[in-house]
Amino acid sequence: MKRLLAIALLALVVVPAAEAKRLPKNYHLWIKMGRCEQPGRQWPGRIYWSHPGPTYGGGLGIYQGTWNAWKVKGMPSRPGLATWRQQMWVANRIAADVGFSAWSCWSRIR
């Protein structure tokens, strides 16, 4: 039983790292979402992945409380401190649970 638990816990850390080697699921959608969430930024067409917040952070404008609920142990404490791959990985978890409508831009990009 202890061995099974150890394997399950290891999978929580290793799976996100393994998935980081290829483009995240819904990659192109998240790029569109990031561009929509950050209109008029100083980098036209680019996404400011390290956006500090304070309420909505990172390139996808993830609410801090939502980030805390869906990130896994070992990930940065704030979305703006996470890599773009980590942000997309968490965003996919959010979308799988509550849908893409968690982002206000969803209605504009779909």
Where in the sequence are the language-model features?
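Peptidoglycan cell-wall recognition and remodeling modules
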Residues: 23-110
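N-terminal prepro-regions of secreted/extracellular proteins
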Residues: 1-24
